Design a protein with these regions (language model features):
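Auxiliary Fe-S-binding modules of radical SAM enzymes
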Residues: 1-31, 95, 223-325
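Conserved, mostly hydrophobic/aromatic
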Residues: 15, 40, 69, 165, ...
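N-terminal pre-triad scaffold of radical SAM enzymes
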Residues: 35-78, 88-109
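Mobile, glycine- and charge-enriched loop segments
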Residues: 48-57, 65-66, 70-79, 126-133, ...
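Active-site-proximal loop/turn and secondary-structure-junction residues that shape catalytic pockets
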Residues: 58-60, 114-116, 144-148, 169-171, ...
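Core AdoMet radical
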Residues: 77-96, 100-190, 198-203, 228-233, ...
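Catalytic cores of alpha/beta
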Residues: 148-157, 209-221, 278-290
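Conserved mixed alpha/beta catalytic, RNA-binding, or beta-rich assembly cores of soluble enzyme
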Residues: 199, 203-204, 213-216, 223
């Protein structure tokens, strides 16, 4: 066993946060995957036990986005199946929430495409969110793009429990992926949501040409923001997007990244989200041993996921416990 990995892991297990030089060492190791996984699992078990959180999402508004995120099929700038905007009715969203609840999913997310939401859409959500909570009895999360503090306050007052807004990548690499808004707009959205009392679900996407330095930068930025959950998405190359020709990530590389993020963010939830099925393939169950504590189950926004029933069975087979409240 690599003694330096063990020493760094013991530091984390004793309650300390690791420094950048230690993080860079962990990222530099070529043959330490199994040691990383072993210790990441120890860190997960100490801070989270064997509990796993599950959530499902529904696209309240899909496609037709004005922004140019190079990985995203929903941008109107690229020739994909989602150039036109499709908006679900309140009843369709309620039906999706009922289905999620029936399948045993305790957290239900509503996600809107686009840079932000209009006043009309916000007013609609102020009525819909409490209806979902009170009539169906399920926790409601949301991702509605770039919002300000006052909008976040209104969502919190309506009963939204957590706001999803990803950084996507590091500040340095962001300009290579998005040009229609800047990194600070995302940072300010996260800070405003936190100030309003909303929980934070903030992570990014991997496999988009970023370096290990970018991955470290994003992890440290997330740590500084003090978020509650870090969704880790892995590129699902979509034909027609600028990144549609990139290769998918290898399962072992993904497990390595999950483990490294567990070292950096020992007490923060880590959710394996978009691209899980395509990229991890037969190694999906290993994500928990690598330090993950949560999964996005069911379909994603523009790609197929895995049935909730299959995920619940996987969690049970591993001797883990799905949190159903």
């Amino acid at each position: 066993m690599n003694e330096r990995i063990a020493d760094i892991a013991e530091k984390v297990l004793n309650g300390s946060l690791i420094e950048r030089n230690e993080i860079e060492y962990l990222f530099s190791i070529d043959d330490g995957l199994w040691d990383l996984l072993y210790w990441a699992n120890q860190i997960r078990q100490k801070n989270f036990g064997n509990k796993v959180k599950i959530c499902s999402i529904v696209p309240g508004r899909l496609g037709g986005c004005s922004q140019d995120c190079k990985f995203c099929a929903q941008s109107s700038r690229y020739e994909t199946a989602f150039q036109e905007t499709k908006t679900l009715t309140d009843e369709q969203i309620l039906d999706a929430a009922r289905e999620a609840k029936q399948k045993g999913v305790p957290h239900f997310g509503i996600v809107y495409s686009g840079k932000t939401i209009s006043e009309k859409e916000l007013a609609k959500l102020e009525k819909l969110i409490p209806k979902i909570k009170n009539e169906i009895g399920i926790s409601v999360c949301g991702g509605f793009g770039i919002i300000d503090y006052k909008q976040a306050q209104r969502l919190a007052k309506a009963g939204l429990s957590r706001y999803n807004h990803n950084l996507e990548t590091s500040r340095n690499h962001f300009k290579n992926i998005v040009t229609t808004h800047d990194y600070d707009a995302r940072i300010e959205t996260v800070k405003g949501a936190k100030k309003a009392g909303l929980g934070l679900c903030t992570g990014g996407i991997f496999g988009i040409g970023e370096s290990d330095a970018d991955r470290i930068d994003m992890a440290l930025q997330i740590r500084e923001l003090g978020v509650d959950m870090v969704p880790m998405n892995f590129l699902y190359p979509i034909a027609g997007t600028p990144l549609g020709g990139l290769a998918t990530m290898q399962p072992r590389e993904i497990l390595r990244l999950i483990a490294l993020y567990r070292f950096i963010l020992p007490k923060t939830g880590i959710k394996v989200a978009g691209g899980r099925v395509l990229n991890l393939r037969d190694m999906q169950s290993w994500m928990f041993y690598a330090g993950a504590t949560s999964i996005l189950s069911g379909n994603y926004l523009t790609t197929a996921g895995r049935a909730v029933e299959q995920d619940l069975k996987m969690i049970s087979d591993l001797g883990l416990q799905a949190e159903l409240i």
